[in-house]
Every structure is written in C-alpha cells, then in structure tokens.
Amino acid sequence: MKYNYSEMSGKYRTFVPNMETKIETTNTGGKVLAYDGDELVGRLVFSFKGNVLSIDHTYAYKEGIGVGSLLVSAVNDYAVSKGLKVLPVCSFAVVWYQRHPQFQDILACKD
C-alpha cells in the first residue's frame, strides 16, 4: 500500500509534501517504509500476535520532519483497516499514542 499524505486533509497535513509510505507484510509481521521522493527516510517494524499489531521499532533517518509520526499514522490506518488492535512497544509509538487520544480505542491492553 502506498499513501501520499500531502493529498490528505486534516490530521496528516503536517508532513513533507512528497513523503509517502509503503507497507510490506508477512504472516508474522511487516514494516512500513517512508520515502521523501526516492529517498528512504524511515521505517517501522511491527509483528502480529493474534489480532494485535505490535509496533516494535521506529527508525527515522531524517529527524524533525515528521517521519516517525508518518510511520505510526500509516501503521495505525493499516491496523484500523484490518480490524486489529495496536500494542505500541517502542518508545516513539507509546508517546505518539499518548499525544493522539482519539486513537485510544484501537490500543490493546498490555498483559
């Protein structure tokens, strides 16, 4: 899947105009890759545990331009579209969900 958030309205408009994401999945998890034009600027790694998508790592190769937020937003949208709950494990994702209370209903409870 490929998203260009510059074409979206509202909550995603803060990102660099040419930034796009691509989601790749396997049976056990996947990754979200962020591109600024042709340049890879970040990635997010996630795993599946039943109906829970666990955000394990977020890497931004360019800081301060919204790469991390773009990655978490993209995986959040993916989880919603698949009916999955989200477990933010990496510290960036934990803080992102704290700052976006409108998505609290998608969060899985930690056991």
Task: Spell out what each predicted region is.
Residues 78-111:
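C-terminal structural segments of small proteins and small subunits
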Residues 57-64:
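A short, internal acetyl-CoA/4′-phosphopantetheine-binding micro-motif in the GNAT/acyltransferase core
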Residues 65-77:
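Conserved acetyl-CoA-binding loop-helix of GNAT-fold acetyltransferases
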Residues 26-30, 36-52:
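A conserved beta-strand-loop-helix scaffold within acyl/acetyltransferase catalytic domains
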Residues 20-22:
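Core catalytic alpha/beta fold that binds nucleotide/phospho-ligands
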Residues 2-18:
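Short, Lys/Arg-enriched N-terminal segments with co-localized hydrophobic residues
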Residues 7-8, 24-27:
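Short helix-onset patch at the extreme N-terminus, typifying the N->h transition
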